[in-house]
Amino acid sequence: MLIIETLPLLRQHIRRLRQEGKRVALVPTMGNLHDGHMKLVDEAKARADVVIVSIFVNPMQFDRPDDLVRYPRTLQEDCEKLNKRKVDYVFAPAVEEIYPQGLEGQTYVDVPGLSTMLEGASRPGHFRGVSTIVSKLFNLIQPDIACFGEKDFQQLALIRKMVADMSYDIEIVGVPIIRAKDGLALSSRNAYLTAEQRKIAPGLYNVMNSIAEKLIAGNRELQEIIAIAEQELNEKGFRADDIQIRDADTLLELTETSKRAVILAAAWLGQARLIDNQSVTLAQ
């Protein structure tokens, strides 16, 4: 496994891979890797000849400076995990390598609508930062496929739209959420939880299951369903942030013709903002 930190060296290897006709898969990450990331790697390995994992804590997508500062950086441990998984390349550039002129005045990629709705409404600039760094990685690495986790449901939808709108010839693969045995979605931010909070954390998944059961039963009183769910979260020790029930295919409001719904949930537990989602097939 080769660790690449500079753009010239990356370009050199990408040119060689292209000349050899290799099928390349990209797994973009911010590091602090867990089993959910390893599932992305496994999916990439099954679909390509060469797997490149990027590790870059992207300052452009953080809406709070304190969150950027305390985001876990575990490059050595991450590389050890990826080496055991027989990843071919790790691209781990410094911020100055990606943004040599700094962030101010930086050209960016924005996806209208999807970047400012739902999660984007509460985190201004976040999705613009995501789409910009992913676009830069696509331009640099020129992958045939790229793997993203379905835990970040809106992010995946945004990347799919960007790829379609910008005519990237890249297959976007969504990989299902990996959960702990108690239902908690694996996330780098789970590291912020205390031992006591970790015991409470699966409550978010349980509340989503309760919402799903109501939707499957035909209940469409969405405001009431959401209000009850927020109350349940608060009673469990969370601070409910945002719960939405949307059309899973468009992320717009549910209509009578919607075939699938997605429950999008975000809640604070101590210093950790946990997000999760669950898709539900609706009775027609």
UniProtKB/Swiss-Prot annotation:
Entry EC no(s)? 6.3.2.1
* A GO molecular-function annotation: ATP binding
What additional remark is attached to this entry?
A: The reaction proceeds by a bi uni uni bi ping pong mechanism.
The identity of this protein, by name, is: Pantothenate synthetase
According to its UniProt entry, the protein's GO biological process terms are: pantothenate biosynthetic process
Q: How does it assemble?
A: Homodimer.
User: Would you identify the family this protein belongs to, as annotated?
Assistant: Belongs to the pantothenate synthetase family.
Q: Give the record's keywords alphabetically.
A: ATP-binding, Cytoplasm, Ligase, Nucleotide-binding, Pantothenate biosynthesis
- One Pfam family, short name please? Pantoate_ligase
Q: Which reaction is the catalytic activity of this chain?
A: (R)-pantoate + beta-alanine + ATP = (R)-pantothenate + AMP + diphosphate + H(+)
GO CC annotation terms, alphabetical: cytosol
UniProt organism field: Salmonella paratyphi A (strain AKU_12601)
